[in-house]
């Protein structure tokens, strides 16, 4: 079984400007490439899990999201970074679906589909809902950006893996 780094997208991979669904709205967070490369060096597979209620709200389409995701993954690949898979929840919060964080649906689906060992995995997010999803799914270590860490890069370089 693999160990993974579950990563929120908005606020971790890219600057969160609210409902980032199009390429022109996307800006990489500082240090993201170095941080992701470090996670790969430590043996983590990268899995992105992202709430995208902007789709349900009509701010952008599923096609816009897929186009942006393809562009983002290409940008990461140019830096030598491969992402195992991107999971997203397109639903509005009031729907009460199982995939939207803080529920653990996306993480549990990834663990099942990709044969991930949750206890030896980590999650990096910027919201309480990210951390709640990780805790509920049984992810071994959960890191919230803001209070203790300013960036994904800081988290990645603070990890001590045996």
Predicted regions: what is each one?
Residues 3, 63, 67-84, 92-123, ...:
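Asp-based, Mg2+/Mn2+-dependent phosphohydrolase catalytic module
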Residues 13-14, 53-57, 93-95, 130-131:
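Short, active-site-adjacent cap segments at secondary-structure transitions
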């Amino acid at each position: 079984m693999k160990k993974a780094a579950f990563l929120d997208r908005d606020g971790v991979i890219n600057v969160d400007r609210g409902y980032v669904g199009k390429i022109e709205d996307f800006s990489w967070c500082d240090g993201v490439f170095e941080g992701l490369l470090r996670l790969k060096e430590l043996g983590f597979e990268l899995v992105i899990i992202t709430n995208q209620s902007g789709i349900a709200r009509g701010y952008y389409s599923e096609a816009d999201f897929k186009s942006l995701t393809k562009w983002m993954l290409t940008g990461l690949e140019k830096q030598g970074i491969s992402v195992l898979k991107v999971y997203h929840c397109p639903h509005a919060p009031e729907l009460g679906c199982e995939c939207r964080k803080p529920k653990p649906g996306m993480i549990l689906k990834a663990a099942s589909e990709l044969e991930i060992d949750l206890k030896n995995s980590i999650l990096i997010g910027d919201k309480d809902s990210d951390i709640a999803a990780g805790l509920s799914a049984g992810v071994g270590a959960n890191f919230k950006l803001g209070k203790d860490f300013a960036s994904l890069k800081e988290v990645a370089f603070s990890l001590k893996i045996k």
